[in-house]
Amino acid sequence: MRYNPALDGLRAVAVMLVLAFHARLFGGFGGFFGVDVFFVLSGYLITRILAEQHAATGSLRIGAFYARRLRRLYPALLLLLAVYLAAAPWVFPEHANHLRDAAVAGLYLSDYGFALWRVPWYLQHTWSLSVEEHFYLVWPMVLMVVFRLPRHWWAPAVLLLAIAATIWRWHVALNDDAWYHPYYRFDTC
């Protein structure tokens, strides 16, 4: 896939929205929108990469795809967790579960950990990495099924999946006491 500098511009806007949200600028507006932009960009890029691979080879090399994703994202997460584990006992001495929280984040389970158990408390910002990693695990398998359909069924199949996902997200948002579940749980993103 060719490099597209416009996508870097969108990433920059998304970063600014997230930073503005956490700095409480603009009344806290824009943070979730910025994360949504990241998710859409990631979904677009991953779908395009996998679709181009399928068009070129007639198959998907999912193992190689997973290995690339892990090599790209995991080193930075491990560095963050190492720094956290080294500093957290002194910076957050009142919190006794640093190792548990790092394990939850390191296993890309922060989205469920926070939604279900309110952990990892000081690493809750890793929820978006968890959601993205879960997407990386599921989406290639969904595309494998879609690519086995006749080509004229591809768009309707993906549209049907999007509609079903939207209905499920609305259901959870309207019938769950926790407002944050639609953001933090993979099954609603």
Task: Describe every region a protein language model picked out.
Residues 3-4, 13-189:
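Hydrophobic membrane-embedded alpha-helices
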Residues 8:
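Mature N-terminal segment immediately following signal peptide/propeptide cleavage
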